[in-house]
Structure formats: structure tokens, C-alpha cells
Amino acid sequence: MDRQQASPLAALTALGRLAAQLEGVSERRRDGLLDWRYHGRLVARQLDDTHVVIRATFEFRDLLLHSFPETFSVPERFAEHMMIVADLEHGNGDAVEDAVIAAWELQSGK
């Protein structure tokens, strides 16, 4: 299935597979929602059935917002934080995966 048209569940599964390949990243479930952490530091976290929040520098966040406005947003509650929200239902799966890899690089210093 094309990641640009994957269901949110398929997108979460793909993120889990990706996270498993990133050195030092572990997946866990809290209150029924997934999160992925690098040695305890947040990489990405599921917000609901169709959205994940991903760690991102402010500069990279701005780039993602301008390049993929259908995929990424910054709700008011994340405006002051180095975080961006990805829409798994309507967004570009490749862009989401790239953002997760960038978050891992940020947290791991790679």
C-alpha cells in the first residue's frame, strides 16, 4: 500500500517498524496510545487514532509546515514547544517517516 494513502492504523504500524530500526528507540503504550523514545527522550507520540506529535527543531518544523501543509500542523498547545503534529489519515506518509527519523537524529545527536 502506498504510504501516502495508508490507513492511520497502517501508518502507525509503519512508524512502529521504522522506530524498531532506529538505534536506541523503544516503543511503549500508555493509556492505549503509542510512543517512541530514545533512551527516555521523546521522539514521537500518538495523540489519537489519526495524529502523532513528533519532536522537531523550530527551523525544521517551519520547513515541514511550508512543504507539507496537508500533513503537518502546530496546534496552539504546541506553539511554544519543539513539536509538530502529523495527520496520519490525510498526510504524506513518507514526510511523516522523514520527520520521525529527524526527531531521532535530534534526540540521539546523530
Task: Annotate each PLM feature.
Residues 1-110:
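Charge-dense, helix-prone N-terminal extensions
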